[in-house]
């Protein structure tokens, strides 16, 4: 029985591995899979590579995981069809690298490196090997780690200027400054300095910001303007400065309770206290996430358990657009998108909604990413790719997504375009356990960050910061 064949057209977005136009069309066997197609591309008659390059193939935005014949059958196509195969270098698994243990749940992580936003904002370049990981914990402390897993700095306790309750968010403002916020309803600014040998460091409290009446669950920072945004359980979005001289006076009625008593006892601590530049009444429920527009720091996006995403004009402290989803929203991230920006929103319904925030957009939701089995608590864009992102969930996993890998949704999924994870990162702390967790119990992941130099860094209920390889996961390494 003769082997079937099908005409294919090879294309790529990577100029360094693009075929000459005369070699882009080829008749290939229908029983071939990804590996066979990769061999064809590497052959002397095609790319003639000096050493084989593993390739993945996309057809209509979906990675090929079967034979071509099985793909044709599943999609009701005949072998007379010309298949357009987009080839990309194969993805590299996000292999486990290290874990850093804490005394309590870890709620927040951020990375300082030569490629991170804070590293780029600062005047001092970050030397390779001196990257730092910032973590915030429910024990009320911040810690700064080197890549070897040593905590080289720990923030002051409550008695001498630290948080009086759990930390929910922490960010590098620059290589010399950190912002944090949490259950004590305050934002705190810290100066960060290292010893000459870089084996030890210090976090010194320099300012306390008061204004919210509920827990602060998310902050965003813009180092060049010294601006900070906050999302609080009181439904408000706060706008702040890290410059003491520019910050308004504090409303003293907000400084009450245990922190005041501690101040009276510890007279040697005199951290300046300031108020917000503005507080915006944005949401009818707890505000859960806030981010700056990466291209325009006068624009921000906020999300809430009231099901809405708001586009904010920070200059006028006004709401310019509202998008309403079907479920409460817990996390946000801005993605470069293809030609325009996309907002990824993690929900309590276990999926990620991709939103076009432009007022002219015809539809609210451009795509849905499905796979998590519990709340989606954090999202971070791939620093190397327009197509990639990683999400953290209360199911105890981080999931890596490639927006080029899609399928048509079922009726139960509400139709539309659906994306599925290309990799699932489990918590390493569970690897030696024989009992299964239910819904992520004990290993919920609360935050995730994706840094080009350090990798995929996640934090969770297992009291660990976990580091996984991050380069080449959704695109080739440089």
UniProtKB/Swiss-Prot annotation:
The entry's cellular-component GO terms read: nucleoplasm; PeBoW complex; preribosome, large subunit precursor
Chain segments carrying region Ubiquitin-like (UBL) domain:
6-89
PROSITE patterns for the chain: WD_REPEATS_1, WD_REPEATS_2, WD_REPEATS_REGION
List the keywords (alphabetical): Nucleus, Repeat, Ribosome biogenesis, rRNA processing, WD repeat
Against InterPro entries, the record matches this protein to: G-protein_beta_WD-40_rep, NLE, WD40/YVTN_repeat-like_dom_sf, WD40_repeat_CS, WD40_repeat_dom_sf, WD40_rpt, WDR12/Ytm1
Is rRNA processing one of the keywords? yes
GO term, biological process aspect, one: maturation of 5.8S rRNA from tricistronic rRNA transcript (SSU-rRNA, 5.8S rRNA, LSU-rRNA)
As recorded in UniProt, coiled-coil segments are: none
**Is Aminoacyl-tRNA synthetase one of the keywords?**
no
Name one molecular function that GO assigns to this entry: ribonucleoprotein complex binding
Q: Which domain of life is it from?
A: Eukaryota
Subcellular localization, per the record?
A: Nucleus, Nucleolus; Nucleus, Nucleoplasm
Q: Which intervals of the chain are annotated as region Disordered?
A: 250-276
**Record Pfam families:** NLE (PF08154), WD40 (PF00400)
Map the WD repeats onto residue numbers: 111-155, 162-200, 211-250, 282-322, 371-411, 440-478
What family is reported?
Answer: Belongs to the WD repeat WDR12/YTM1 family.
Q: What does this protein do?
A: Component of the NOP7 complex, which is required for maturation of the 25S and 5.8S ribosomal RNAs and formation of the 60S ribosome.
Quaternary organization: Component of the NOP7 complex, composed of erb1, nop7 and ytm1. The complex is held together by erb1, which interacts with nop7 via its N-terminal domain and with ytm1 via a high-affinity interaction between the seven-bladed beta-propeller domains of the 2 proteins. The NOP7 complex associates with the 66S pre-ribosome. Interacts (via UBL domain) with MDN1 (via VWFA/MIDAS domain).
Q: What is the name listed in the Swiss-Prot or TrEMBL entry for this protein? A: Ribosome biogenesis protein ytm1
Species for this entry? Botryotinia fuckeliana (strain B05.10)
